[in-house]
């Protein structure tokens, strides 16, 4: 969520004429992230986020904004797109698609504990089930075809050892994706980027018995239809990892996975290929971070992520695959 496209006060005033959101009180860019231009917007009616989409086209955008609306209507705490005066959920700003969504309650938990992982696991499963009847289809745009296109572009910037790992893992994943087992894995709309900075936590209500309360998931603009297990693997690789080493934190991983399967139990096929999917989740973000680091786009506010973090995670997942916990109730 960097700022690639600047928005002046005059630009904003013209844009806001298409919304019934009252008067603008505050407006500022959001520096984190690397894909779209994002701004916090406060009006006399509430708090919102304005996003200008730098890569998604107007033809692609309905999948994402309609998915958020669908999930919100099914009780999943996600940002709700705000309709314009013509009833549409997005328009054009500086020649690019743009939308306003509601701002969720809470703050990111960048040092999550077991209790946060339980909340995330349960809600991720609820989100997957809520998306089963979503009528639109958009593949995960950062999956195998994108990896195949991107690895040759980043190969000149990496060491020989890194290139061997990139190409070897690409071959491993291509074989996995082509298998009958992969085809049989449960699938549907996935977040595909559920890192700890894409979820918010609010204070738990008194007398609920919970120490934390999930405010919701946001930033669905990498979402796509994929295997649900991939979404789980991406989430575990961020929420349940020892940051210095990339190794899984057993307590957090166990808590998240057990919580998930109290809502949607894993299939036998998912259990067989958990290790492959952990590797796929790590590989996707190693490739994208290498690309963003070595071939960056110009931006007013941009903080590229360290590619080495997901290289460490991938090497760890190859060495130590782990297994999904057996099903039983989560405390």
From Swiss-Prot:
Keyword Isomerase: no
GO biological process: threonine biosynthetic process
EC number(s) on file: 2.7.1.39
Pfam families referenced in this protein's UniProt entry, alphabetically: APH
Gene3D superfamilies (alphabetical): 3.90.1200.10, Phosphorylase Kinase, domain 1
Keywords from the named record: Amino-acid biosynthesis, ATP-binding, Kinase, Nucleotide-binding, Threonine biosynthesis, Transferase
Keyword DNA repair assigned: no
Species annotation: Burkholderia pseudomallei (strain K96243)
Pathway field: Amino-acid biosynthesis; L-threonine biosynthesis; L-threonine from L-aspartate: step 4/5
Family from the record: Belongs to the pseudomonas-type ThrB family.
Protein name, as recorded: Homoserine kinase
Domain of life: Bacteria
Biological classification of the source: Bacteria, Pseudomonadati, Pseudomonadota, Betaproteobacteria, Burkholderiales
GO molecular function terms noted in the UniProt entry: ATP binding; homoserine kinase activity
Top-level class of the enzyme under EC nomenclature: transferase
Entry-linked NCBIfam families: PRK05231.1 (NF003558), thrB_alt (TIGR00938)
Annotated catalysed reactions: L-homoserine + ATP = O-phospho-L-homoserine + ADP + H(+)
